[in-house]
């Protein structure tokens, strides 16, 4: 068995990563691939909490720009994260990983309500916990949710699983050939360099809790496991104040 560096993690999966090449919606093939990747980490006896984004279906900020009330648009985004979480739960259970879904907005017919102590108990019993519905409040991103849940469950690290992006760059490498990749940054660097990794609320919370983040490409097979065992891939973002 590989020696793990992080014994309890929050895995933040962007909505776009669940869509794959389709660009929107949920790609069952991608779900199956992710489930196997997560199982490889689960088999190392790592405690896993998962937060899914919803950008493959809906973005509250986009809805607000089109004239919707921002709070209403954000609630729609929360529902999108729950749909993604249910799809991932199904994929994980198909490969034999016991999984519980908890939502910040109660919908008991399909998931448990989010209760921190219950989530901790699930993790102690060796279950993966998927946190759906964001924080349950409008104006807060799923990146903030990941930072919050990481603090609440005592995670050692937040893994920012990106769709085709292998770290943090000085500019968009797809459009700027001079863009350089950072191997390590601090949360203050993100703000001072105006790097669009996560919103400032999420950065501030991560800085306060001093939980590190690792940004990496989830599309590369084996990358989640490589990060957990301590291989140097992606970009490490320290929570140093």
Swiss-Prot record:
Keyword field: Allosteric enzyme, ATP-binding, Cytoplasm, Kinase, Nucleotide-binding, Pyrimidine biosynthesis, Transferase
Species classification: Bacteria, Bacillati, Bacillota, Bacilli, Lactobacillales
Family matches, as Pfam families: AA_kinase
Residues binding UMP, per UniProt: 54, 74, 135-142
Molecular functions per Gene Ontology: ATP binding; UMP kinase activity
Enzyme class: transferase
Physiological role: Catalyzes the reversible phosphorylation of UMP to UDP.
EC number from the UniProt entry: 2.7.4.22
Protein name as catalogued: Uridylate kinase
Gene Ontology CC terms: cytoplasm
NCBIfam families, A to Z: pyrH_bact
Residues where ATP binds: 12-15, 55, 59, 163, 169, 172
Regulation of catalytic or functional activity: Allosterically activated by GTP. Inhibited by UTP.
Oligomeric form and interacting partners: Homohexamer.
Pathway assignment: Pyrimidine metabolism; CTP biosynthesis via de novo pathway; UDP from UMP (UMPK route): step 1/1
HAMAP family in the record: PyrH_B (MF_01220_B)
Catalytic reaction equation(s): UMP + ATP = UDP + ADP
Species per Swiss-Prot/TrEMBL record: Lactobacillus helveticus (strain DPC 4571)
Renumbered residue ranges of the record's region Involved in allosteric activation by GTP: 20-25
Subcellular location: Cytoplasm
Family the UniProt entry places it in: Belongs to the UMP kinase family.
A GO biological process held by the record: UDP biosynthetic process
């Amino acid at each position: 068995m590989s020696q793990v560096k992080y014994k309890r993690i929050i895995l933040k999966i962007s909505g776009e990563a669940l869509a794959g090449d389709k660009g929107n919606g949920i790609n069952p093939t991608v779900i199956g691939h992710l489930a196997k990747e997560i199982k490889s980490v689960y088999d190392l006896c790592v405690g896993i909490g998962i937060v899914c984004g919803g950008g493959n279906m809906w973005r509250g900020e986009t809805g607000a720009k089109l004239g919707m009330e921002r709070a209403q648009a954000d609630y729609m985004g929360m529902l999108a994260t729950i749909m993604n979480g249910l799809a991932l739960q199904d994929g994980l259970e198909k490969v034999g990983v016991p999984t519980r879904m908890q939502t910040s907005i109660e919908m008991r017919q399909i998931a448990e309500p989010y209760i921190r102590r219950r989530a901790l108990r699930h993790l102690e019993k060796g279950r993966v916990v998927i946190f759906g519905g964001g924080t349950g409040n409008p104006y807060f991103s799923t990146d903030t949710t990941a930072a919050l849940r990481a603090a609440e469950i005592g995670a050692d690290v937040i893994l920012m699983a990106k769709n085709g992006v292998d770290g943090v760059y000085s500019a968009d490498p797809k459009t700027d050939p001079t863009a350089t990749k950072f191997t390590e940054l601090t949360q203050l660097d993100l703000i001072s360099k105006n790097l669009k990794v996560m919103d400032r609320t999420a950065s501030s919370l991560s800085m306060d809790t001093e939980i590190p983040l690792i940004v990496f490409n989830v599309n590369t097979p084996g990358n989640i496991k490589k990060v957990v065992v301590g291989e140097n891939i992606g970009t490490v973002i320290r929570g140093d104040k």
